[in-house]
């Protein structure tokens, strides 16, 4: 579970930026649509956008899921959800912490975690919670529409192997939390790691602690 201070810090950062977020980063729309297509959710399935912000992938997910599917968009910042609603983004919306999701075990087919992990005080706990709600074989994308270098520069930092999305740290965390990394795109235009949910009965052979 994120602490109150961690949630507050996230809200303080995003709330004043919510109203013009999509305008400032309008060039990212196709990248969100592309990662939604890569995740390839099943027709009629359930997609979770954890830390959805303004839910920029929701329309692409709805197109893939068809009329019987469902996109669930959760964020801790009300202002971002309000901006998503004003933009007419589809799906259901709710305020929820990605480390304490109001969802049943093994209820979700696909998860998008876009820009999420760097804002969690305990990213490993977040990945474990995402694994809890995902069906065996379900897929997760840890995604940023810009490179790690550009993301660090946006926050006046330089990339480090200690960063939550640095492959040297992220890949072991994924394995330890019930995911099997399938692909890594640590490129100049985006960051995207896609992983599959390991069936719980197989975890004993992967995780030793």
What are these regions (language model features)?
Residues 67-68, 134-139:
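Short glycine-dipeptide loop
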Residues 162-178:
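Short alpha-helix
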Residues 112:
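A conserved beta-strand element that flanks and buttresses the S-adenosyl-L-methionine
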Residues 142-144:
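Acidic carboxylate diad motif detector
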Residues 124-136:
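A short glycine-rich, Lys/Arg-flanked "PGG" loop and its adjoining helix->strand segment in the class I
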Residues 1-43, 56-60, 79, 83, ...:
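Conserved class I S-adenosyl-L-methionine
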């Amino acid at each position: 579970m994120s602490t109150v201070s961690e949630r507050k810090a996230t809200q303080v950062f995003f709330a004043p930026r919510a109203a013009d977020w999509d305008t400032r980063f309008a060039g990212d729309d196709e990248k969100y649509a592309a990662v939604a297509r890569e995740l390839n959710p099943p027709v009629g399935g359930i997609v979770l956008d954890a830390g959805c912000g303004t839910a920029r992938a929701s329309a692409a997910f709805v197109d893939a899921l068809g009329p019987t599917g469902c996109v669930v968009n959760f964020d801790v910042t009300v202002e971002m959800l309000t901006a998503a609603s004003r933009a007419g983004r589809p799906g259901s919306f709710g305020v929820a912490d990605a480390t304490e999701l109001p969802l049943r075990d093994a209820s979700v087919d696909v998860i998008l975690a876009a820009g999420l992990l760097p804002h969690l005080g305990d990213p490993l706990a977040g990945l474990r919670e995402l694994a809890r709600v995902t069906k065996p074989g379900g897929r997760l994308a840890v995604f940023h529409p810009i490179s790690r270098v550009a993301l660090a520069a946006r926050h006046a930092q330089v990339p480090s192997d200690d960063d939550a999305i640095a492959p040297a740290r992220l890949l072991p965390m994924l394995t330890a939390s019930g995911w099997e990394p399938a692909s890594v795109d640590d490129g100049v235009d985006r960051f995207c790691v896609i992983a599959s949910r390991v069936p719980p009965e197989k975890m004993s052979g992967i995780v030793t602690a």
